[in-house]
Curated annotation (Swiss-Prot):
Domain of life (superkingdom): Bacteria
Annotated InterPro entries: Chromosome_partition/occlusion, ParB/Sulfiredoxin_dom, ParB/Sulfiredoxin_sf
Organism of provenance: Escherichia coli (strain K12)
SUPFAM superfamilies tied to this protein: ParB/Sulfiredoxin (SSF110849)
More info: Encoded in the Rac prophage region.
Name of the protein: ParB-like nuclease domain-containing protein YnaK
PANTHER family: CHROMOSOME-PARTITIONING PROTEIN PARB-RELATED
Gene giving rise to this polypeptide: ynaK
Length: 87
């Protein structure tokens, strides 16, 4: 039986950006994410590896920092290669 995905909350200070993240976010995009989180809450958790490195959700983390949040919802993915993290 396969393990089910589990959403947990992690402190922002435990997360670090993925060094090879190819995507950038403009100030306008982050502002839109801030407004979305204010209006709808978290609808999409941040994906991180077992070391706390952000795989997907850099913009959401930036928005959370702007909102002065202490923690964010994450899904921890294990055993990914660098190639898989870049996709």
């Amino acid at each position: 039986m396969s393990e089910k995905l589990k959403i947990v909350y992690r402190p922002l200070q435990e997360l670090s950006p993925y060094a090879h993240n190819a995507r950038t976010h403009s100030t306008e995009q982050v502002a839109q994410l801030v407004e979305s989180i204010k209006q709808f809450g978290w609808t999409n958790p941040v994906l991180i590896d077992e070391k706390g490195e952000i795989i997907a959700g850099h913009g959401r983390v930036m928005a959370a920092e702007m909102l002065k949040m202490d923690s964010v919802p994450v899904i921890v993915l294990s055993g990914l290669t660098d190639e898989q993290k870049q996709r």
